[in-house]
Amino acid sequence: MSSKQLNIGLFGFGCVGFGLYEVLSRTPTLKASIKRICVKDKNKSRPIDSSHFVYDREAILGDEDINLVVELIDDADAAFEIVTEAMRRGKAVVSANKKMIAEHFAELLVLQRKYKVPFLYEAASCASIPIIRNLEEYYDNDLLERIEGIVNGSTNFILTKTFSENLSYPEALRQAQQLGYAESNPILDTGGFDAKYKLVILLAHAFGLVVPPEEIVNIGIDRLGALEIRYAREKELKIKLVATAYKTDEDKVAAFVMPKFVNHQSKLYTVDDVFNGVITKTCFADQQFFAGRGAGAHPTASAVLSD
């Protein structure tokens, strides 16, 4: 695909969609351009001319000149319909929809093999951190024993404010909502569901396991109380929402998402604000640490662009 012009059909023009548009506009040397953008709301004010937009998905899916579909919408069910139909029509697909991918992983892999088209989703795991590519390429010949990390920027922002500025949990959450890091109904983030969907994706690339999301335990930061926060402050610890997967002594894999006390020795201790951080442990290379922005238009768009 890299040797020919990529004609992109983009679904969604929110934060990340606009970020991708800007990034592509600033890199004219790339052999890629957005031909059409499909959105739902005709009346919504947008920062570029309305001639770029279409409102029927068939305008993209039925266009034979479009050879790459980029899916960046919130609706997981609609995203699955778009992605599967694009693959059936022989179009390459890039997606950032971690919920859709986690819930339909097995089906999507079957479709990818059947129609022999690229299906890439680096942005669905840790935004700007190229963790999937490293798991697939760098660790291909090493034995991965453990992977854990902060993979949700919204909750990390809330926890950072709680400890660095001594804000209460409700105050920190309200600030995250005001800045657009958390939704008005933030349970997907604060309940650990977003992190769980990302862990499902990491499990597939770290250990070759395709696991339904409901099989992974997730406990979110919404379960934290004043006692845990006070204890962490007294002991000079931080609390981080950590997604963890590791091989057990019985050669099985344990996986879960939950808040964790971290001390100064942990690499995750320094991962604050909306940043993500991932630690891998392998048989030969031992520990390695990756960090990068886990939220925002341009960081996430950079991962979409790399795909």
Protein language model features and the residues they cover:
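General beta-strand structural signal in soluble alpha/beta enzymes
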Residues: 53-55, 71, 94-96, 119-123, ...
